[in-house]
Design a protein with these regions (language model features):
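C-terminal helical cap and adjacent loop that interface with cofactors, partners, or active-site loops
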Residues: 1, 147-182
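A contiguous active-site-proximal alpha/beta segment in oxidoreductase catalytic domains
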Residues: 1-44
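Active-site-lining helix/loop region of Rossmann-like oxidoreductase modules
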Residues: 27-158
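A short glycine/serine-rich beta->alpha loop
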Residues: 5-11, 70, 173-181
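Short amphipathic alpha-helical segments, especially helix-boundary/capping motifs
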Residues: 2, 57-63, 167-169
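Glycine-centered flexibility sites
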Residues: 10-12, 16, 91, 164, ...
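Residues in flexible loops and secondary-structure boundaries
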Residues: 16, 41-46, 67, 168-170, ...
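Catalytic-loop motifs flanking and including active-site residues across diverse enzymes
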Residues: 18, 78-82, 182
Length: 182
């Protein structure tokens, strides 16, 4: 690539593609942009114990809160980096980013080969990041990750909404699969 003067971009599904490069690509059709909102709802059930633990799956709500404080429950990794990448691509300066992680509480039994979640326990983590520009929210990324969302009427998928000229809305369901991790 260097000898030919070209760039090569390699990405994962998320982070990398869905809540990063795909948003940037879609923004290219806009003459101006007022805001960007994106959400990725995925099913964690194919993933292993390391990923499930990082989302607090199987914990009590109290243990989830303790895990947030201790740094063992992390939610999605990479929201600040994704936001800064998007902002740089569209020419925005970001003042601050606020992140929020909330437990998704199961109302029914949800089970994977690695964990059985009872009603009242944590089935996943809703992680949201909001970037501000000139005091206003300008980029919102949301990632509710949980095991078997369909058991309570949830549907996996990826959604991107760009408010601008023109408005752009892209929705895909089911989610673009990211592949199981450890």
């Amino acid at each position: 690539a260097v000898s030919r003067g070209v760039a090569v971009v390699g990405t994962g599904i998320n982070p990398g593609f869905v809540l990063d490069l795909l948003i940037i690509t879609l923004s290219g059709v806009c003459a101006d942009i007022q805001s960007i909102n994106a959400e990725r709802v995925n099913d964690l059930s194919p993933y292993g114990p390391t990923v499930l633990a990082s989302q607090g799956v199987g914990l009590s709500p109290e243990a989830f809160a303790e895990g947030l404080e201790a740094g063992t429950v992390v939610g999605h990794i990479g929201f600040p980096e994704s936001i800064h990448l998007i902002a740089a691509a569209v020419g925005w300066d970001i003042e601050r980013i606020e992140e929020k992680r909330e437990a998704i509480i199961a109302g029914v039994v949800r089970e994977t080969p690695f964990v059985r979640v009872q009603p009242g326990q944590v089935a996943g983590c809703l992680h949201t990041a909001v970037a501000y520009r000139q005091g206003e929210p300008i980029i919102t990324l949301s990632h509710p990750q949980q095991i078997h969302p369909q058991l309570e009427g949830g549907e996996t998928g990826d959604r991107i909404e760009i408010k601008g000229t023109p408005d752009v809305r892209l929705c895909g369901s089911p989610e673009i699969p990211g592949g199981p991790g450890p």
